């Protein structure tokens, strides 16, 4: 589906999706754009309306900031974190094989630049209104 993310709820019914993959999104590193992060409270609230009860969200990124922010979102909302890895190519034992099996164009570029690629896998609560964390690192933006 190619659409604006704000319209995603109109494409899926309740419990229709088992897994969401967010690969190399814009980390929205400007202070006034924090609400645009695809792993932020507003978007997780949207995803929770169509993700199945055992469904998962996967985040693969080169942005340490986004990785740490998303871990704070998980913590403040008391979500179940299934996998958290700061460098998937340095410690592959705890990373599912499908995470490293395919490399996006961005991933290949970031690896060539020596940037570590991070990965998170977590479960959402259904029909839940998510909270935004008080993420101190955002104050430095």
Regions found by a protein language model. Give the residues of each.
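Conserved class I S-adenosyl-L-methionine
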Residues: 29-34, 56-77
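Conserved Class I S-adenosyl-L-methionine
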Residues: 42-48, 68-91
């Amino acid at each position: 589906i190619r659409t604006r993310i704000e319209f995603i709820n109109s494409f899926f019914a309740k419990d229709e999706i088992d897994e969401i993959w967010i690969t190399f999104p814009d980390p929205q590193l400007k202070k006034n754009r924090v609400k645009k992060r695809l792993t932020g409270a507003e978007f997780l609230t949207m995803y929770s309306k169509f993700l199945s009860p055992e469904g998962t969200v996967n985040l693969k990124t080169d942005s340490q900031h986004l990785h740490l922010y998303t871990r704070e979102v998980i913590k403040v909302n008391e979500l179940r974190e299934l996998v958290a890895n700061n460098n998937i190519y340095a410690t592959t034992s705890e990373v599912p094989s499908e995470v490293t099996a395919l490399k996006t164009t961005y991933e290949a570029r970031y690896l060539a630049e020596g940037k570590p690629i991070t990965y998170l896998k977590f479960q959402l609560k259904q029909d839940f209104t998510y909270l935004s964390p008080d993420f101190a690192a955002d104050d430095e933006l």
